[in-house]
Amino acid sequence: MAIKPILFNTEMVRAILDGRKSCTRRLVKPQPDEKHTYQLGFVIDSTEKKYVGCFGFGIDEYGGSIQYVKPPYGYAPGDILYVRETWERFECWNCEGDDNGNCPKNPQESVLNRTCGCYMYRATDEIFGDTKWHPSIHMPKEAARIWLRVTDVRVERLQDITIDEIRKEGLEPRFDVKDKFSDGIARGRFLELWNSTIKKSDLDRYGWDANPWVWVIEFERCEKPEGV
């Protein structure tokens, strides 16, 4: 069992906590050569250990040339992921407590009697005064509150996503739809989300219209492993 980090923005953290998100898509880097004619699939075992866990693209139908790409952090089914999210370490002396002066996370204790502090998360908590949030990429493993188990990893084109998979991404329509989350509305929401994660200078290569190859990583919530 490998334990690895994964980053999510605040909106997606809320979707995971709400039970709406069980899938994420990440860019394949580097993108396979456009001349490739078929996909070999994942390398399960090889005398060339560096290729194990990689996905192979064949450049011609006879396999004369193969391009290998590796999932981010080498994600594979069975891996345990800890979510890095926007966070802060809030010390007790900065906390006013609840209406009774008790710790919001441990109501049986007065904040005056606590010295350990606690981790706060932008997705669900508020901080006060001059305290500032730390970027998710800097969150230590010990601060992680969300743990995931990878159930599937595959490669596909971005625009191959279906309406059911868009739901698994944690997206919902921005307004009430009487009949259903229609395909057009769903794709529009996902298009906006995807393009918001891409630098403007890279939209022509990695944006929705470019239809890049992506890693599809499916997961489920799990408990923090013992001893971690």
Residue ranges and their predicted role:
Residues 1-228:
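Secondary-structure transition motif
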